[in-house]
Swiss-Prot record:
Keywords: GTP-binding, Hydrolase, Metal-binding, Nucleotide-binding, Riboflavin biosynthesis, Zinc. It comes from Campylobacter hominis (strain ATCC BAA-381 / DSM 21671 / CCUG 45161 / LMG 19568 / NCTC 13146 / CH001A). GO terms for molecular function: GTP binding; GTP cyclohydrolase II activity; zinc ion binding. Its EC number is 3.5.4.25. One of its GO terms (biological process) is riboflavin biosynthetic process. The active site is at D121 (proton acceptor), R123 (nucleophile). This is GTP cyclohydrolase-2. Its cofactor is Zn(2+). It catalyses: GTP + 4 H2O = 2,5-diamino-6-hydroxy-4-(5-phosphoribosylamino)-pyrimidine + formate + 2 phosphate + 3 H(+). The lineage of its organism: Bacteria, Pseudomonadati, Campylobacterota, Epsilonproteobacteria, Campylobacterales. Pfam families: GTP_cyclohydro2. Pathway: Cofactor biosynthesis; riboflavin biosynthesis; 5-amino-6-(D-ribitylamino)uracil from GTP: step 1/4. Zn(2+) binds at C50, C61, C63. Binds 1 zinc ion per subunit.
Length: 193
């Protein structure tokens, strides 16, 4: 793994003042959004890119809601959002749009990925281990509903899982049920939203 690291820059946002640093891994450029001060265990959100949700506000998923809730939490409590360039559970934007087309025809998110020849989830988290080691972080509170992220980290202690509570909408209810029932996502708290 060949990794280049950018300088740190200030980033004012509608969620508050952050610092940002980019990590270039081969052809992918990941972003770390930092709110200081932070202390161990460090509040960490690992967020995979979702152009349709994060930038356009798609209601088919809960990605933008999770990102925004995480930024609010980090702004208030300190920590980092590690924004990974792994669009569509790492199948890429082109294939994700083809998966959306299959979902429009009745397949769920997993069936669509399989129909296109992909695994349920193609993401990897080695770069996260590298980033946490770079910042000398040994213990984290992981903001996630995805148990795979808990298992995907190898060089850090996960002290706690912090659920991200999102209210479902009529467009993403099936998607969220599939994530819960088939991928093991921990979404029971969403019913309280």
């Amino acid at each position: 793994m060949n990794i280049e690291i950018s300088n740190v820059a200030k980033l004012p946002s509608r969620f508050g003042m952050f610092k940002v640093q980019a990590f270039k891994e081969d052809e992918k450029e990941h972003l770390v959004i930092i709110k200081e001060p932070y202390k161990e265990p460090v509040n960490i959100r690992i967020h995979s890119e979702c152009l349709t949700g994060d930038a356009i506000g798609s209601l088919k998923c809960d990605c933008r809601d999770q990102l925004e809730e995480s930024l609010k939490f980090i702004e208030k409590n300190g920590g980092m959002v590690i924004y990974l360039r792994q669009e569509g559970r790492n199948i890429g934007l082109f294939n994700k749009i083809n998966a959306y087309n299959l979902q429009d025809k009745g397949l769920d998110t997993i069936e669509a990925n399989h129909q296109l020849g992909f695994k349920t989830d193609e993401r990897t988290y080695e770069i996260v281990d590298f980033i946490l080691k770079y910042y000398k972080i040994k213990s984290i509170n992981l903001l996630t509903n995805n148990p795979k992220k808990l298992m995907g980290l190898h060089n850090v202690k996960v002290a706690a899982r912090v659920p991200i509570i999102i209210k479902p909408n009529k467009f993403n209810e099936k998607y969220l049920q599939t994530k819960k029932n088939e991928m093991g996502h921990l979404l029971d708290d969403n019913k309280k939203a």
